[in-house]
Amino acid sequence: MDPFLLAAAHLLLRADRPEVIEESCQISSLLTGNTDYARCQATVLRETLLKGGLDQTVLDLLAGDQREATELVFEREEEDPVETSRQFGNNCHLPGSFQGALHAFLHHRESEDRFQETLRAVLRAGGCNCSRANYAGALLGASGAVIPSNWLDRLNRAEDIVNTIQRAANISHLGEGK
């Protein structure tokens, strides 16, 4: 999961570009030689961002083991996300970490408190939950979910974080138009 997370910011800042999936795979390959799941994760996140949500039509963009792993998540969408994540594998290995994050996101996507419920389900599943939480958070943000204000109130150095994000966005667009 971590190799894709290295590329997530690039994808989110440039989702409108058709070549962003391949660029994300190139970035991910800096940490791993296998980019099959990075491509899957990038495709799912990009579709979520471009459509403001996610449905099973994303399966048409996937192939092989990655499609099968994603299909299984949709098939089990109604099941308890904590137990399902444990069954997929609650460590950092793929496809389990991808499946656990995606499952929690899909399971809670209609909830008014989807941000909190999704991330709390990811955390309650235990194991190495940081990668799952990062990917679930990216899916939530891409779908328009908002970090609850009472969570932001407890955040240290929020202004520094916002400034860093703005600088990164500005840097990412410097080379465009060449």
Protein language model features and the residues they cover:
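Conserved glycine-rich phosphate/nucleotide-binding loop
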Residues: 142-178
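Phosphate-handling active-site elements
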Residues: 16-20, 110-114, 143-155
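Amphipathic alpha-helical interface segments
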Residues: 1-109, 118-125, 139
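Short, small-residue alpha-helix embedded
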Residues: 133-144
